[in-house]
C-alpha cells in the first residue's frame, strides 16, 4: 500500500505543476492585455522594416517544387530517424531486426526510384514531360 501512496503523491505533484503552468500563462496573457498599448491606426498595421519604407509586397509566390522538396525531405528525414533508432539497438535486435531494417531500406529505395521515374525530382518541366511521354509508350 505504501507504493500506491507514493504514486498518488507523485500524481498530485504533477497536477499542481500543471495548474501552476496554466495559471502563470493566464496571468501573463492577462497582464499583457491590460498593460499593452491599444492604439490602432494605419501605421500600426503596417509591417516594421527598421524604420525604412516597405518595398514590394510581403507575399512571395513560391513554386510548388519547393513544397514538394520540403515534403520529401520531411518524409526521408523521419525515415532516417527510424534508421538511427534501429542502429542504436542493432545488437539487441539480432538477425530479425537486421532483416527488418533491410526490408525498410528496400521500401525506401523503391519509393525513391518511383519518385525519380515519375519525375518528382526533376526541376525542368521539359524533362518531366519527356519522361512521362516515355512512360506512356
UniProtKB/Swiss-Prot annotation:
Localization, UniProt: Cell inner membrane
InterPro entries documented for this protein: NAD(P)H_OxRDtase_bac/plastid, NADH_UbQ/plastoQ_OxRdtase_su3, NDAH_ubi_oxred_su3_sf
Coiled coil: none
Gene Ontology MF terms in the entry: NADH dehydrogenase (ubiquinone) activity; NADH:ubiquinone reductase (non-electrogenic) activity; quinone binding
TM stretches of this protein: 12-32, 66-86, 96-116
Keyword presence, Cell membrane: yes
This protein's record includes keyword NAD: yes
Keywords: Cell inner membrane, Cell membrane, Membrane, NAD, Quinone, Translocase, Transmembrane, Transmembrane helix, Transport, Ubiquinone
Membrane topology: Multi-pass membrane protein
Pfam families the record matches: Oxidored_q4
Catalytic activity: a quinone + NADH + 5 H(+)(in) = a quinol + NAD(+) + 4 H(+)(out)
Cellular component, GO annotation: NADH dehydrogenase complex; plasma membrane
EC numbers for this chain: 7.1.1.-
Sequence similarity: Belongs to the complex I subunit 3 family.
Subunit structure: NDH-1 is composed of 13 different subunits. Subunits NuoA, H, J, K, L, M, N constitute the membrane sector of the complex.
Functional description taken from the UniProt entry: NDH-1 shuttles electrons from NADH, via FMN and iron-sulfur (Fe-S) centers, to quinones in the respiratory chain. The immediate electron acceptor for the enzyme in this species is believed to be ubiquinone. Couples the redox reaction to proton translocation (for every two electrons transferred, four hydrogen ions are translocated across the cytoplasmic membrane), and thus conserves the redox energy in a proton gradient.
PANTHER family reported in the protein's UniProt record: NADH-QUINONE OXIDOREDUCTASE SUBUNIT A (PTHR11058:SF21), NADH-UBIQUINONE OXIDOREDUCTASE CHAIN 3 (PTHR11058)
Name of the protein described by the UniProt record: NADH-quinone oxidoreductase subunit A
Organism of derivation: Pseudomonas fluorescens (strain Pf0-1)
Amino acid at each position: 500500500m505504501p507504493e500506491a501512496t507514493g504514486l498518488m503523491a507523485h500524481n498530485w505533484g504533477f497536477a499542481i505543476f500543471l495548474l501552476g503552468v496554466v495559471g502563470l500563462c493566464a496571468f501573463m496573457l492577462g497582464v499583457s492585455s491590460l498593460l499593452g498599448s491599444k492604439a490602432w491606426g494605419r501605421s500600426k498595421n503596417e509591417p516594421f522594416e527598421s524604420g525604412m519604407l516597405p518595398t514590394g509586397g510581403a507575399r512571395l509566390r513560391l513554386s510548388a517544387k519547393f513544397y514538394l522538396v520540403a515534403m520529401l525531405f520531411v518524409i526521408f528525414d523521419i525515415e532516417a530517424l527510424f534508421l538511427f533508432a534501429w542502429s542504436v539497438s542493432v545488437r539487441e535486435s539480432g538477425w530479425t531486426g537486421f532483416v527488418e531494417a533491410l526490408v525498410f531500406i528496400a521500401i525506401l529505395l523503391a519509393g525513391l526510384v518511383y519518385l525519380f521515374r515519375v519525375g518528382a525530382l526533376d526541376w525542368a518541366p521539359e524533362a518531366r514531360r519527356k519522361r512521362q511521354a516515355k512512360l506512356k509508350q
